[in-house]
């Protein structure tokens, strides 16, 4: 089998492996209580180029799209609106599983939140970022569903681009607001992508296509 064919056939598992290795590398540093250079650089970039009286309310607004209240409400709305209840159930179970996984990882690693600069107050542990991890899993799964089921190319790709921007913006907002390190957000994204590969494969096999 040629390398190109191997990559095409196993692309999702390659992505899972790369993201998982990246997450574990960050988690190891977090476990040893290290503040990484990327944490300092990430915050300096955001504080230098983004923080202002104009952008702070925007960051506060955007971060709500990764919060529990909004995601639960959106899940209920989608479950009601989507005719295929198996898909609706898969959206609900995705939110539940990723939330439990996030809390499990937080309690294992127990990284304190940043204290130097806070625009808003948050409780609980810092790594991996719950908003980032859950948003990547939730909106990432919606991106997958849109790609798979939406026929109109304009609607499909516009939705995918907007949701991708939203995921990144939620992650940036957590650093901006001073409640997470850069590595918290990156770690949340990486483990969530790995999780999504497994979740989508399992849901397709045991629920949607059953």
Predicted regions and their residues:
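Transmembrane helix-loop junctions in multipass membrane proteins, especially transporters and channels
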Residues: 32-33, 83-84, 107-115, 179, ...
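Alpha-helical membrane-inserting segments
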Residues: 23, 27, 55, 101, ...
């Amino acid at each position: 089998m040629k390398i190109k064919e191997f990559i095409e056939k196993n692309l999702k598992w390659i992505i899972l492996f790369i993201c998982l290795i990246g997450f574990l590398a960050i988690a190891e540093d977090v476990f040893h209580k290290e503040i990484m250079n990327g944490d300092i650089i990430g915050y300096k970039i955001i504080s230098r180029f983004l923080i202002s009286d104009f952008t702070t309310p925007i960051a506060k607004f955007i971060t709500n799209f990764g919060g529990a209240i909004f995601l639960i409400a959106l899940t209920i709305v989608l479950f009601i609106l989507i005719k295929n209840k198996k898909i609706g159930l898969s959206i609900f179970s995705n939110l539940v599983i990723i939330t439990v996984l996030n809390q499990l990882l937080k309690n294992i690693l127990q990284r304190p939140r940043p204290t130097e600069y806070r625009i808003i107050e948050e409780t609980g542990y810092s790594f991996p970022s719950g908003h980032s991890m859950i948003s990547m899993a939730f909106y990432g799964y919606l991106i997958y569903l849109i790609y798979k089921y939406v026929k109109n190319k304009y609607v499909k790709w516009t939705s995918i681009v907007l949701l991708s921007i939203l995921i990144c913006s939620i992650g940036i907002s957590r650093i901006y607001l001073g409640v997470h390190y850069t590595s918290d957000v990156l770690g949340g994204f990486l483990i969530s992508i790995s999780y999504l590969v497994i979740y989508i494969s399992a849901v397709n096999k045991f629920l949607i296509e059953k």
